Amino acid sequence: MTNIRKTHPLMKILNDTFIDLPTPSNISSWWNFGSLLALCLIMQILTGLFLAMHYTPDTSTAFSSVAHICRDVNYGWFIRYLHANGASMFFICLYAHIGRGLYYGSYMFQETWNIGVLLLLTVMATAFVGYVLPWGQMSFWGATVITNLLSAIPYIGTTLVEWIWGGFSVDKATLTRFFAFHFILPFIITALAAVHLLFLHETGSNNPTGIPSNMDMIPFHPYYTIKDILGALLLILTLLALTLFTPDLLGDPDNYTPANPLSTPAHIKPEWYFLFAYAILRSIPNKLGGVLALLLSILILIFIPMLQTSKQRSMMFRPFSQLLFWTLIADLLTLTWIGGQPVEHPYIIVGQLASILYFLLILVLMPTAGLIENKLLKW
């Protein structure tokens, strides 16, 4: 008799996705991040659900409801910090996953890649609206500053901002709708992730060499399930260490002060995972120019498959491209650091140079390196 997992309509889908899936035999630990992202998403939805049971999306009670969760709800402090630091782990996995895709040429699966970029934008939107909910100083002013950027759009900007706010400033209506968005978006992310996986399984996974691996495939289970479990344990260990020992390491102290529209914090800045984009935004003195640069810093990922000049897919055997890739990583770390610094000399010029280098590397230097490597190999 055929095994039920191969015949049952639902089990068959799960079987073809996680059990009998033919997988390249040589994929490294950089391929672990997909499953880690799934784990992060599940964890964020569960902790978020329990937080939503005690949170009130109202300007007069939001801050105190978060304090109530931390003080009076059983293990409320733990759930709250798991959720906050879980977001950081989510972005660490997300950036590692994108970095892997860039390095090994996984972006040549264009549908999978484009859904991935859409997923990145949705996760960023979710994190942004979620950051507003505790209604601390940085929540309020972060929301005010970032939503205000839309006013740079010619003609309709101001109307658009007031429409998003639901009034003439960030207020009760804004908080309520941001809570609604923050609740619904993770489910949209889940649906998009399923589509992402669907497109990936149309082509099969890439591998470190970038060479088709049809001739050497192994079943996903048990080889990669056990590998994913190891990755998951390391992720959980890191998250627990962060949550239990230094829960506020990545947060902002200003968020322990209730939101006050009459007092602006000295340095308004977003969470660490948005600092690179924030630095690019600030490095351009013009408001509209800054907004466009901010958008392009993320949307540039869509154009990467079109900028592929090398005849080799992966960077595994391309030393020039590797050097430029790691320069890009160093540049992003520099931008992240600059985004958290005040707007003064020498940070302004460093941020501007790092922003120029970011676009130069992706749009000019990396495609040129690909052409040079082709030439050196007489291809």
From Swiss-Prot:
Pfam families: Cytochrom_B_C (PF00032), Cytochrome_B (PF00033). One of its GO terms (cellular component) is mitochondrial inner membrane. It is found in: Mitochondrion inner membrane. Its main location: mitochondrion. The keyword Transmembrane applies. A ubiquinone binds at H201. CDD domains: cytochrome_b_C, Cytochrome_b_N. GO terms for biological process: mitochondrial electron transport, ubiquinol to cytochrome c. It comes from the Eukaryota. Heme b b566 binds at H97, H196. Its cofactor is heme b. The chain crosses the membrane at residues 33-53, 77-98, 113-133, 178-198, 226-246, 288-308, 320-340, 347-367. GO terms for molecular function: metal ion binding; ubiquinol-cytochrome-c reductase activity. Keywords: Electron transport, Heme, Iron, Membrane, Metal-binding, Mitochondrion, Mitochondrion inner membrane, Respiratory chain, Transmembrane, Transmembrane helix, Transport, Ubiquinone. PROSITE patterns: CYTB_CTER (PS51003), CYTB_NTER (PS51002). Coiled coil: none annotated. Heme b b562 binds at H83, H182. It is a multi-pass membrane protein. Binds 2 heme b groups non-covalently. Belongs to the cytochrome b family. The cytochrome bc1 complex contains 11 subunits: 3 respiratory subunits (MT-CYB, CYC1 and UQCRFS1), 2 core proteins (UQCRC1 and UQCRC2) and 6 low-molecular weight proteins (UQCRH/QCR6, UQCRB/QCR7, UQCRQ/QCR8, UQCR10/QCR9, UQCR11/QCR10 and a cleavage product of UQCRFS1). This cytochrome bc1 complex then forms a dimer. Heme 1 (or BL or b562) is low-potential and absorbs at about 562 nm, and heme 2 (or BH or b566) is high-potential and absorbs at about 566 nm. Component of the ubiquinol-cytochrome c reductase complex (complex III or cytochrome b-c1 complex) that is part of the mitochondrial respiratory chain. The b-c1 complex mediates electron transfer from ubiquinol to cytochrome c. Contributes to the generation of a proton gradient across the mitochondrial membrane that is then used for ATP synthesis. This is Cytochrome b. It comes from Delphinus capensis.
